[in-house]
Design a protein with these regions (language model features):
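Conserved polar/disulfide-associated segments of primarily extracytoplasmic proteins
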Residues: 50-149
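N-terminal targeting sequences that direct proteins away from the cytosol to non-cytosolic compartments
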Residues: 5-66, 109-110, 127-129, 143, ...
Length: 176
């Protein structure tokens, strides 16, 4: 019995050291406009523009801002009034085709966001200078509006490190 307790104690220490029991704690701020709201990392910058038929929100990492958009991570959120001209299925297919033709790894899935099932396309690859790049498009319709969330990271930014920051926004994104 003592042998099992020692083994369990060692396993518990290994799990605690490896971080398997801790979660990432990212400090956030709240943002709300045009019936959408979300949390975002408190070190990031948010700007928005509201027009008659659309709302654009940009959420940018400090690295993106300080490099004049040559390195870092950014999210562009676009809300459009639904019309017959909006054809996201064609846009999705074009994005996947372009990613695959340029040798990038593209995935096409769905995700639950803002209480609906949304299209979720992501890709990883290299830019023209050999830096890792990451892009993601989440789009959905709700309340007669079309929502597009366009994530991008590149220029040598640490893509794996930024994904939890993007996840904070995705998990908290809400539409009235």
């Amino acid at each position: 019995m003592k042998k099992y307790l020692i083994i369990l104690a060692v396993l518990a220490v290994v799990v605690m050291i490896s971080g398997c029991t801790t979660t990432s704690n990212i400090n956030t701020k709240n943002f709300s406009t045009s019936g959408m709201s979300f949390q975002y990392p408190d070190t990031w910058n948010v700007s928005s523009q509201v027009n008659n038929n659309s709302t654009q929100v940009m959420v940018a990492s400090p690295e993106f801002i300080s490099s004049n958009a040559t390195k870092g991570s950014v999210l562009l959120i676009i809300k459009l009034s639904k019309s017959g001209d909006n054809n996201m299925s064609q846009t999705r297919q074009e994005l996947i085709t372009q990613a695959q033709q340029s040798g990038q790894n593209a995935t096409n899935a769905t995700i639950n966001i803002a209480g609906v099932t949304a299209s979720d396309i992501s890709y990883t690859g290299k830019d023209t200078t050999g830096n890792n790049t990451y892009g993601r498009l989440i789009d959905f319709e709700k309340n007669n509006s079309l929502y597009l969330l366009l994530f991008a990271s590149g220029g040598g930014a640490d893509i794996d490190a930024v994904k939890p920051y993007f996840d904070v926004i995705i998990k908290s994104f809400n539409v009235e």
